[in-house]
């Protein structure tokens, strides 16, 4: 998990952490296309970023929203214990495993976040 990162990737990581929102054991972070431009990075550079918020003791589910295009997000979900985030991903046409899953949502960020939170809260 801890390899050698470029300065741009580290800058991107800091920007992503600055978007952190926590509520009810759910941590949400967001990556925008502008962040990639500002840090000269690419979507490959966000690999594992979804894992970091889950390190916090009170976080049961970590969700990363990566902007693909206007009003379209790739969602990565990670969970602890018996919380099956694959069910959340499947509700949006995605899939995965119990503790690691993903999907795509065509909506603005606030709408996408609200839709994901409804599904995640139903599991916690």
Segments (PLM) and residue ranges:
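Hydrophobic helix-and-loop "lid/oligomerization" segment in the mid-to-C-terminal part
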Residues: 1-91, 96-124
């Amino acid at each position: 998990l801890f390899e050698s990162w470029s300065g741009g990737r580290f800058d991107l990581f800091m920007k992503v952490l600055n978007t952190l929102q926590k509520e009810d054991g759910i941590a949400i972070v967001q990556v925008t296309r502008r962040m990639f431009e500002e840090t000269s990075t690419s979507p490959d550079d966000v690999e594992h970023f979804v894992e970091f918020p889950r390190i916090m003791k009170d976080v049961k589910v970590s969700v990363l929203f990566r902007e693909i295009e206007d009003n379209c997000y790739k969602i990565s979900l990670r969970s602890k214990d018996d919380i099956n985030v694959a069910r959340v991903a499947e509700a949006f046409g995605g899939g995965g495993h119990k503790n690691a899953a993903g999907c795509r949502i065509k909506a603005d960020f606030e709408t996408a976040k609200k839709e994901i939170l409804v599904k995640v809260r139903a599991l916690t």
